[in-house]
């Protein structure tokens, strides 16, 4: 019933107006029920001070630099909103997270480039010493090949093996020049075990080139660059031994002067 109704009598007009008022009150109640729950402004969650709505408002830029910063903030804001939206809905995918990560990596790359541009001249002025490990990593080809500057310690180490080889050759020549002596000993060999002990001992002796053991005759013949007394003393530590024949000891040459 729209507008006001005017009836012929005042009583009928009052009845119609009262019915119209009742109809309006019922329709407003039904509209409130159909519109959903009313927001409770007295809810403590809504009144919580930690709930900030600063992200919902974006300030307009005042200059070009502020405009770039606001664009970055807008992208970050969009990424955050997309992440929170996906978390709330439970959907998969990381489009917002990927965009945010890409933005962060771009900022890090720009920071590194700016730092390298600033620090490169100072690094170029610093010269690394020759003995350091960074010297080999330089761009100078002479430093890599080592043709200009050589480490004296390395040259000494390279020359050392050559000197050792010379000493070894000298020892071999001296050993070859000396006369090999043959010594015959009589050793108390009671069993094959005693023979094995003497054989092992002679094999370990220095200067012995060859030896022969006659178990039946208890005779041991040793050949090498070693004196008879040294062989006798060495074998006597294992078994009782003595010379088979008295060794001929060379007598010193004594010049007789005529009176």
From Swiss-Prot:
Pfam families noted in UniProt: HMA
CDD domains: HMA
Domain HMA: 180-246
InterPro entries listed in its UniProt record: HMA_dom, HMA_dom_sf, NAKR1-3, NAKR2/3
Species annotation: Arabidopsis thaliana
GO function terms (MF aspect): metal ion binding
Binding of a metal cation, residues: 191, 194
Region Disordered, annotated ranges: 141-165
Lineage: Eukaryota, Viridiplantae, Streptophyta, Embryophyta, Tracheophyta
Biased composition (Basic and acidic residues): 151-165
Record's protein name: Protein SODIUM POTASSIUM ROOT DEFECTIVE 2
Domain of life, source organism: Eukaryota
Gene3D superfamilies: 3.30.70.100
Keyword Repeat: no
Signal peptide (UniProt feature, chain positions): none
């Amino acid at each position: 019933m729209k507008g006001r109704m005017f009836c012929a009598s005042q009583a009928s007009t009052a009845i119609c107006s009262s019915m119209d008022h009742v109809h309006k009150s019922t329709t407003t109640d039904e509209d409130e029920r159909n519109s959903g729950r009313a927001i409770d402004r007295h809810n403590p969650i809504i009144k919580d001070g930690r709930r900030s709505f600063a992200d919902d408002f974006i300030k307009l830029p005042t200059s070009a630099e502020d405009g770039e910063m606001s664009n970055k903030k807008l992208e970050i804001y969009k990424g955050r909103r997309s992440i929170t939206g996906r978390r709330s809905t439970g959907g998969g995918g990381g489009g917002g997270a990927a965009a945010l990560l890409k933005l962060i990596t771009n900022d890090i790359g720009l920071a590194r480039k700016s730092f390298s541009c600033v620090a490169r001249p100072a690094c170029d002025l610093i010269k690394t010493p020759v003995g350091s490990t960074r010297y080999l990593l330089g761009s100078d080809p002479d430093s890599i090949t080592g043709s200009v500057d050589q480490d004296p310690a390395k040259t000494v180490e390279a020359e050392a093996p050559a000197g050792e080889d010379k000493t070894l050759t000298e020892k071999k020549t001296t050993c070859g020049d000396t006369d090999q002596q043959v010594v015959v000993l009589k050793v108390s060999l009671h069993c094959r075990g005693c023979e094995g002990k003497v054989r092992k001992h002679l094999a370990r002796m220095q200067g012995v080139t060859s030896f022969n053991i006659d178990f039946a005759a208890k005779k041991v013949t040793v050949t090498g660059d070693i004196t008879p007394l040294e062989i006798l003393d060495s074998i006597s530590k294992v078994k009782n031994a003595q010379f088979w024949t008295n060794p001929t000891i060379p007598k010193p040459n004594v010049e007789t002067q005529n009176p």
